Amino acid sequence: MNRNELFERLMKLEHHVEQLTTDMSELKDLTVELVEENVALQVENENLKRLMNKTEESVETHLDKDNYKHVKTPSPSKDNLAMLYREGFHICKGELFGKHRHGEDCLLCLNVLSD
């Protein structure tokens, strides 16, 4: 293999690595968007369930409390964590908790929100 062939192969490899980096970054951004949307929809869904539950309680007061089916509501702390994450702070367990993310997404934080 002569120098020119070696140089061309290195250039092709560099181009492939750059393309992989770009693709990985795009996939990460898409994943973050989807997880954030999922968390927002879960919170909205739980709020709607809570609202429906209150409405059903006022309409169906004759039901016995033992027979009434309660829907599990999200903890207010999870809502607070989601709010802190949207404001740009780490909510993942460990030494990063409470530190500013500087506009970067954190997969560990998103994992906490998705649990």
Swiss-Prot record:
Disulfide partners: none
Residues binding Zn(2+), per UniProt: H90, C92, C106, C109
InterPro entries: YabA
Example GO biological process: DNA replication
Co-factor binding details: Binds 1 zinc ion per subunit.
Cofactor(s) this protein cannot do without: Zn(2+)
Predominant location: cytoplasm
Pfam families for the chain: YabA
Keyword line: Cytoplasm, DNA replication, DNA replication inhibitor, Metal-binding, Zinc
Compartments where found: Cytoplasm, Nucleoid
Top-level taxon of origin: Bacteria
SUPFAM superfamilies in the cross-refs: Myosin rod fragments
KW Membrane (keyword) present: no
GO cellular component labels: nucleoid
NCBIfam families according to UniProt: PRK13169.1-2
Assembly with partners or alone: Homotetramer. Interacts with both DnaA and DnaN, acting as a bridge between these two proteins.
Protein's job: Involved in control of chromosome replication initiation. Inhibits the cooperative binding of DnaA to the oriC region, thus negatively regulating initiation of chromosome replication. Inhibits the ability of DnaA-ATP to form a helix on DNA; does not disassemble preformed DnaA-DNA helices. Decreases the residence time of DnaA on the chromosome at its binding sites (oriC, replication forks and promoter-binding sites). Tethers DnaA to the replication machinery via the DNA polymerase beta sliding clamp subunit (dnaN).
Family classification: Belongs to the YabA family.
Protein name: Replication initiation control protein YabA
Organism listed in the record: Staphylococcus epidermidis (strain ATCC 35984 / DSM 28319 / BCRC 17069 / CCUG 31568 / BM 3577 / RP62A)
UniProt lineage: Bacteria, Bacillati, Bacillota, Bacilli, Bacillales
